Design a protein with these regions (language model features):
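Conserved small/polar residues in nucleotide/adenosyl-binding loops
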Residues: 228-229
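Conserved active-site neighborhood of enzyme catalytic/cofactor-binding cores
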Residues: 186-220
Length: 229
């Protein structure tokens, strides 16, 4: 998702509830997670992290956001990659069905394993790096059990993506739990004209001038798909 962790938390959380309700209503005959594509979406919450709880704030993702603990726990349990130990998460939001699901995490419906799902789980198991081909986002993490705490991320893609900031070439560098330098992310709220065509010039946070990318010959990056990496 080129729009980052914030929209992942919002959208995928709702999809989890839909999956549970349909799964239970059909007694497991319809499972929206029963595809290899779901595995990639489910692992995004862990793989987009540079260090634990630290994610790059590209596009309109606000800096400091991290994947929802409930989503991470739910996906691990659905895929059978955690122990059976109960790990309840304090509920958030205003949906009673999700509240109950978060309090009783052992009730998560397990995904039936297929060769395709096992293959994607293996492909998504790299602990050191992640690369998202469509959004052209790269993550490199320190190896576990070492003293290194430095992690990096870089973003390519185009300037025609959802919630784009005309920031091809942006990056983030994290040391431990702190983002030391890089993309400042999106605003806490949107002005009424934030999505107008001239917004990248009016609001520096939405244009390349407000990002860690070069200003070449006094010119900032333009919008559109012609600018890409």
């Amino acid at each position: 998702c080129s729009e980052g962790v914030g929209y992942y938390n919002y959208g995928f959380r709702a999809y989890i509830l839909l999956r549970e309700e349909v799964y239970r209503a059909t007694q497991g005959k319809i499972d929206f997670f029963q595809t290899p594509k779901f595995v990639r979406i489910a692992r995004y919450g862990k793989k987009i992290q540079m260090n634990e709880g630290v994610c790059p704030a590209y596009s309109d993702c606000r800096i400091g956001l991290s994947p929802d603990r409930f989503i991470l726990s739910y996906c691990d349990r659905a895929l059978g990659v955690t122990s059976a130990e109960e790990q309840p998460v304090l509920p958030k939001g205003n949906n009673l069905s999700l509240h109950l699901l978060e309090l009783f995490t052992s009730r998560v419906a397990k995904v039936g394993m297929t060769d395709g799902i096992r293959q994607v789980l293996q492909e998504e198991s790299d602990a050191l790096r992640a690369y998202y081909e469509q959004s052209v986002i790269f993550i490199a993490r320190p190896a576990g059990g070492t003293s290194c705490r430095l992690a990096i991320s870089a973003k390519g893609g185009t300037n025609a993506e959802n919630h784009n900031h005309n920031d091809v070439g942006s990056y983030a560098v994290a040391l431990g739990s702190e983002t030391m330098v890089g993309d400042q992310g999106g605003p806490n709220s949107y002005p009424g004209d934030y999505f107008n065509g001239d917004a990248p010039q009016k609001y520096k946070i939405k244009g390349s001038f407000g990002h860690p990318v070069p200003v070449v010959d006094g010119r900032t990056q333009s919008s559109g798909c012609l600018l890409y990496t």
